[in-house]
């Protein structure tokens, strides 16, 4: 049997941004309560040695899984230091990877309603839009 490789997109991220992400997730899960239903998996709960953490975010009947990695090969810049993030959208047996911009839009669509319903229309018309 021959080897089969699966390629996964991992975004190289500064470790301080990963720490900020983890603390932001924990704040919204345990303090503000805006992240109801989110599940945080620590590195010691994962069988994979490179996984630093996983956050499972329910989006209707699907979910977004954000996995942080450590110990990867260093990137082009010194500050990468082998840290990375992969973002996956899963629904039943189907999964696909998404980019950080789409993940941000999905999370804000379901959990953080920052603007009123008419904000998009006002923005398109050139009016100033402010959060609630």
From Swiss-Prot:
InterPro entries: Vif (IPR000475). Zn(2+) binds at residues 108, 114. This is Truncated virion infectivity factor. Counteracts the innate antiviral activity of host APOBEC3F and APOBEC3G by promoting their ubiquitination and degradation. Acts as a substrate recognition component of an E3 ubiquitin-protein ligase complex: mechanistically, Vif hijacks a host cullin-5-RING E3 ubiquitin-protein ligase complex (ECS complex) and the transcription coactivator CBFB/CBF-beta to form an active E3 ubiquitin-protein ligase complex that targets APOBEC3G and APOBEC3F for polyubiquitination, leading to their degradation by the proteasome. Coiled coil: none annotated. The BC-like-box motif mediates the interaction with elongin BC complex. The lineage of its organism: Viruses, Riboviria, Pararnavirae, Artverviricota, Revtraviricetes. One of its GO terms (cellular component) is membrane.
């Amino acid at each position: 049997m021959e080897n089969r490789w699966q390629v996964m997109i991992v975004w190289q991220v500064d470790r301080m941004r990963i720490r900020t992400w983890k603390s932001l997730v924990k704040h919204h899960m345990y303090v503000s309560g805006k992240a109801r239903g989110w599940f945080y998996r620590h590195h010691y709960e994962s069988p994979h040695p490179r996984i630093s953490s996983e956050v499972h975010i329910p989006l209707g009947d699907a979910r977004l899984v954000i996995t942080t990695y450590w110990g990867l090969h260093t990137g082009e810049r010194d500050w990468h230091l082998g840290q990375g993030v992969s973002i996956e959208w899963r629904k039943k047996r189907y999964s696909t990877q998404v980019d950080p911009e789409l993940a941000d839009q999905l999370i804000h669509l379901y959990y953080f309603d920052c603007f009123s319903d008419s904000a998009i229309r006002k923005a398109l018309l050139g009016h100033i839009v402010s959060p609630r």
